[in-house]
Protein backbone atom coordinates (compact mmCIF):
# COMPACT_ATOMS: atom_id res chain seq x y z
CA UNK A 1 0.00 0.00 0.00
CA UNK A 2 1.12 3.54 -0.61
CA UNK A 3 0.98 4.86 2.97
CA UNK A 4 4.38 3.99 4.40
CA UNK A 5 4.82 5.83 7.69
CA UNK A 6 7.38 5.35 10.43
CA UNK A 7 6.10 4.93 13.98
CA UNK A 8 7.04 8.55 14.77
CA UNK A 9 5.39 9.88 11.62
CA UNK A 10 2.24 7.96 12.53
CA UNK A 11 2.30 9.60 15.97
CA UNK A 12 2.55 13.10 14.47
CA UNK A 13 -0.29 12.53 12.01
CA UNK A 14 -2.42 10.91 14.69
CA UNK A 15 -1.94 13.92 16.96
CA UNK A 16 -2.96 16.39 14.26
CA UNK A 17 -6.03 14.32 13.38
CA UNK A 18 -6.99 14.13 17.04
CA UNK A 19 -6.55 17.82 17.83
CA UNK A 20 -8.36 18.88 14.65
CA UNK A 21 -11.49 17.26 16.10
CA UNK A 22 -11.10 17.58 19.87
CA UNK A 23 -9.61 21.11 20.13
CA UNK A 24 -10.51 22.88 16.87
CA UNK A 25 -9.98 26.28 18.52
CA UNK A 26 -6.26 25.46 18.90
CA UNK A 27 -5.84 23.96 15.43
CA UNK A 28 -3.65 24.15 13.27
CA UNK A 29 -0.79 23.34 15.67
CA UNK A 30 2.58 24.99 16.26
CA UNK A 31 5.73 22.88 16.58
CA UNK A 32 5.55 23.18 20.37
CA UNK A 33 1.93 22.07 20.37
CA UNK A 34 2.81 19.04 18.24
CA UNK A 35 5.65 18.13 20.63
CA UNK A 36 3.27 18.32 23.58
CA UNK A 37 0.65 16.24 21.77
CA UNK A 38 3.18 13.59 20.72
CA UNK A 39 4.54 13.21 24.25
CA UNK A 40 1.18 13.11 26.04
CA UNK A 41 1.03 10.52 28.79
CA UNK A 42 -2.69 9.88 28.24
CA UNK A 43 -4.22 8.23 25.17
CA UNK A 44 -0.76 7.33 23.85
CA UNK A 45 0.82 3.88 23.55
CA UNK A 46 3.74 3.81 23.77
CA UNK A 47 4.44 7.05 25.63
CA UNK A 48 7.16 8.90 23.70
CA UNK A 49 9.65 11.61 24.57
CA UNK A 50 10.38 13.33 21.27
CA UNK A 51 12.50 16.48 21.23
CA UNK A 52 11.53 19.66 19.41
CA UNK A 53 14.25 19.06 16.81
CA UNK A 54 13.01 15.51 16.20
CA UNK A 55 9.44 16.71 15.77
CA UNK A 56 10.53 19.54 13.47
CA UNK A 57 12.36 17.04 11.26
CA UNK A 58 9.26 14.83 11.17
CA UNK A 59 7.05 17.78 10.26
CA UNK A 60 9.41 18.84 7.47
CA UNK A 61 9.40 15.31 6.04
CA UNK A 62 5.62 15.01 6.20
CA UNK A 63 5.19 18.38 4.50
CA UNK A 64 7.47 17.23 1.66
CA UNK A 65 5.40 14.06 1.36
CA UNK A 66 2.22 16.16 1.20
CA UNK A 67 0.71 14.63 4.35
CA UNK A 68 0.84 18.02 6.12
CA UNK A 69 0.96 21.65 5.08
CA UNK A 70 2.14 24.81 6.77
CA UNK A 71 -0.22 27.64 7.65
CA UNK A 72 0.86 31.21 8.35
CA UNK A 73 -1.79 33.88 8.70
CA UNK A 74 -1.35 37.65 8.56
CA UNK A 75 0.50 38.86 11.64
CA UNK A 76 1.21 35.31 12.80
CA UNK A 77 4.95 34.79 13.15
CA UNK A 78 4.61 31.18 14.29
CA UNK A 79 4.38 28.54 11.58
CA UNK A 80 1.57 26.11 12.19
CA UNK A 81 0.74 22.75 10.69
CA UNK A 82 -2.44 21.06 9.55
CA UNK A 83 -2.95 17.57 8.24
CA UNK A 84 -3.58 16.67 4.60
CA UNK A 85 -3.47 12.96 5.34
CA UNK A 86 -7.19 12.50 4.78
CA UNK A 87 -10.23 14.49 3.65
CA UNK A 88 -8.10 17.25 2.14
CA UNK A 89 -9.14 19.08 -1.01
CA UNK A 90 -6.68 17.36 -3.30
CA UNK A 91 -5.98 14.17 -1.32
CA UNK A 92 -7.15 10.70 -2.30
CA UNK A 93 -7.96 9.31 1.14
CA UNK A 94 -11.53 10.13 2.15
CA UNK A 95 -12.79 8.92 5.53
CA UNK A 96 -16.06 9.28 7.41
CA UNK A 97 -16.08 10.79 10.90
CA UNK A 98 -16.23 7.32 12.42
CA UNK A 99 -13.37 6.09 10.26
CA UNK A 100 -11.24 9.11 11.20
CA UNK A 101 -11.85 8.37 14.89
CA UNK A 102 -10.88 4.71 14.52
CA UNK A 103 -7.80 5.37 12.38
CA UNK A 104 -6.62 8.15 14.71
CA UNK A 105 -7.01 5.99 17.81
CA UNK A 106 -5.12 3.14 16.16
CA UNK A 107 -2.31 5.50 15.09
CA UNK A 108 -2.01 6.81 18.65
CA UNK A 109 -2.46 3.59 20.65
CA UNK A 110 -1.65 0.63 18.42
CA UNK A 111 -3.67 -2.57 18.22
CA UNK A 112 -7.00 -2.50 20.06
CA UNK A 113 -10.27 -4.39 20.33
CA UNK A 114 -13.52 -2.93 18.98
CA UNK A 115 -14.63 -2.32 22.57
CA UNK A 116 -11.47 -0.40 23.39
CA UNK A 117 -11.80 1.63 20.21
CA UNK A 118 -15.39 2.58 20.99
CA UNK A 119 -14.42 3.79 24.46
CA UNK A 120 -11.19 5.56 23.54
CA UNK A 121 -12.46 7.24 20.37
CA UNK A 122 -15.57 8.76 21.95
CA UNK A 123 -14.09 12.28 22.19
CA UNK A 124 -13.78 12.24 18.42
CA UNK A 125 -16.94 10.33 17.48
CA UNK A 126 -19.73 8.71 19.49
CA UNK A 127 -20.52 5.29 18.07
CA UNK A 128 -24.14 4.25 18.54
CA UNK A 129 -23.22 0.65 19.37
CA UNK A 130 -20.59 -2.04 18.90
CA UNK A 131 -22.10 -3.02 15.57
CA UNK A 132 -21.20 0.41 14.19
CA UNK A 133 -17.59 0.06 15.36
CA UNK A 134 -17.33 -3.37 13.78
CA UNK A 135 -18.89 -2.07 10.56
CA UNK A 136 -16.30 0.72 10.36
CA UNK A 137 -13.46 -1.74 10.96
CA UNK A 138 -14.82 -4.11 8.32
CA UNK A 139 -15.06 -1.25 5.85
CA UNK A 140 -11.48 -0.14 6.51
CA UNK A 141 -10.26 -3.73 6.12
CA UNK A 142 -11.98 -4.30 2.77
CA UNK A 143 -11.70 -0.95 0.97
CA UNK A 144 -10.55 -1.11 -2.63
CA UNK A 145 -7.89 1.54 -1.94
CA UNK A 146 -6.81 -0.27 1.24
CA UNK A 147 -6.77 -2.34 3.29
CA UNK A 148 -6.14 0.11 6.11
CA UNK A 149 -6.67 -2.21 9.09
CA UNK A 150 -6.23 -5.93 9.76
CA UNK A 151 -7.71 -8.20 12.40
CA UNK A 152 -5.15 -9.97 14.58
CA UNK A 153 -5.67 -13.47 15.99
CA UNK A 154 -7.69 -13.53 19.19
CA UNK A 155 -5.39 -13.89 22.19
CA UNK A 156 -5.97 -16.86 24.54
CA UNK A 157 -8.59 -16.00 27.15
CA UNK A 158 -9.76 -12.88 25.30
CA UNK A 159 -13.29 -12.41 23.95
CA UNK A 160 -12.41 -9.94 21.20
CA UNK A 161 -9.76 -9.85 18.51
CA UNK A 162 -7.61 -6.74 18.22
CA UNK A 163 -7.27 -4.64 15.09
CA UNK A 164 -4.07 -2.98 13.85
CA UNK A 165 -3.73 -0.14 11.34
CA UNK A 166 -1.66 -0.78 8.22
CA UNK A 167 -0.20 2.67 7.58
CA UNK A 168 3.32 1.86 8.87
CA UNK A 169 5.93 0.41 6.54
CA UNK A 170 7.39 -2.05 9.05
CA UNK A 171 4.22 -4.04 9.71
CA UNK A 172 2.11 -4.26 6.56
CA UNK A 173 3.37 -7.59 5.21
CA UNK A 174 3.72 -9.20 8.62
CA UNK A 175 0.24 -8.23 9.78
CA UNK A 176 -1.23 -9.53 6.52
CA UNK A 177 0.54 -12.83 7.12
CA UNK A 178 -0.72 -12.97 10.70
CA UNK A 179 -4.26 -12.34 9.49
CA UNK A 180 -3.98 -15.14 6.93
CA UNK A 181 -2.87 -17.58 9.61
CA UNK A 182 -5.47 -16.51 12.17
CA UNK A 183 -8.25 -18.94 11.19
CA UNK A 184 -5.78 -21.85 11.50
CA UNK A 185 -4.44 -21.09 14.95
CA UNK A 186 -6.16 -24.05 16.61
CA UNK A 187 -3.05 -25.99 15.70
CA UNK A 188 -0.29 -25.45 18.28
CA UNK A 189 2.46 -25.11 15.70
CA UNK A 190 0.54 -22.51 13.71
CA UNK A 191 -0.29 -20.60 16.88
CA UNK A 192 3.42 -20.46 17.68
CA UNK A 193 4.12 -19.15 14.18
CA UNK A 194 1.49 -16.45 14.61
CA UNK A 195 2.95 -15.41 17.96
CA UNK A 196 6.43 -15.33 16.43
CA UNK A 197 5.20 -13.05 13.65
CA UNK A 198 3.58 -10.71 16.17
CA UNK A 199 6.84 -10.62 18.11
CA UNK A 200 8.73 -9.81 14.92
CA UNK A 201 6.37 -6.90 14.26
CA UNK A 202 7.05 -5.49 17.74
CA UNK A 203 10.82 -6.00 17.32
CA UNK A 204 10.87 -4.25 13.93
CA UNK A 205 8.91 -1.35 15.36
CA UNK A 206 11.34 -1.01 18.30
CA UNK A 207 14.36 -1.16 15.98
CA UNK A 208 12.85 1.49 13.72
CA UNK A 209 12.16 3.78 16.68
CA UNK A 210 15.74 3.30 17.89
CA UNK A 211 17.17 4.08 14.45
CA UNK A 212 15.07 7.23 14.14
CA UNK A 213 16.21 8.30 17.60
CA UNK A 214 19.88 7.91 16.67
CA UNK A 215 19.39 9.73 13.37
CA UNK A 216 17.84 12.62 15.27
CA UNK A 217 20.82 12.98 17.62
Curated annotation (Swiss-Prot):
Q: Which Gene3D superfamilies match?
A: Winged helix-like DNA-binding domain superfamily/Winged helix DNA-binding domain (1.10.10.10)
Query: What domain of life does the native source organism fall in?
Result: Bacteria
A Pfam family annotated for this UniProt entry: DUF480
Listed SUPFAM superfamilies: Winged helix' DNA-binding domain
Q: Which family does it belong to?
A: Belongs to the UPF0502 family.
Q: What is this protein called?
A: UPF0502 protein KPN78578_10500
User: Which classification does the entry list for the species?
Assistant: Bacteria, Pseudomonadati, Pseudomonadota, Gammaproteobacteria, Enterobacterales
Amino acid sequence: MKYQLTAHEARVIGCLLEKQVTTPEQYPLSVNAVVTACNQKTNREPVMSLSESEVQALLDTLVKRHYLRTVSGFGNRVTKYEQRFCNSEFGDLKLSAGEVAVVTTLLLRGAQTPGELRSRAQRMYEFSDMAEVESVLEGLATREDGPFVARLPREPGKRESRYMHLFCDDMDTLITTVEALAPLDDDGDLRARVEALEGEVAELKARLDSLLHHLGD
